[in-house]
């Protein structure tokens, strides 16, 4: 029988590093993230699970869905794997997710 457990304590040990190098890595990481992700809008992050052998964002983009919108929910024009909030309701997001899944399945034969 599988038991449900809750982790209440974790110890993490990180290797030592040079402060300047670590800060430069952090700045570079944040720059790359800002280039690729729609950080100026509220979103729940990457929305669709990666299908085997493909990338959800690439499939969504190839189906011409970047910028698609239902109500206040929109497929990001910057990264098609993100649904951004432009004043949408939960119903808007659920409808947009279902629309994206239908279109990708029809055009690509892949379930997101």
Model-predicted segments: where are they?
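Phosphate/pyrophosphate- and phosphate-bearing ligand-binding catalytic cores of soluble enzymes
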Residues: 1-95, 102-107, 111-112
């Amino acid at each position: 029988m599988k038991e449900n457990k809750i982790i209440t304590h974790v110890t993490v040990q990180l290797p030592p590093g040079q402060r300047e190098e670590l800060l430069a890595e952090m700045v570079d990481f944040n720059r790359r993230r800002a280039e690729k992700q729609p950080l100026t809008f509220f979103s729940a992050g990457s929305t669709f699970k990666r299908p085997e052998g493909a990338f959800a964002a690439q499939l969504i983009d190839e189906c011409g869905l970047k910028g698609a919108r239902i109500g206040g929910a929109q497929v990001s024009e910057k990264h098609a794997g993100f649904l951004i909030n432009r004043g949408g309701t939960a119903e808007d997001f659920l409808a947009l997710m279902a629309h994206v899944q239908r279109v990708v399945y029809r055009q690509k034969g892949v379930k997101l």
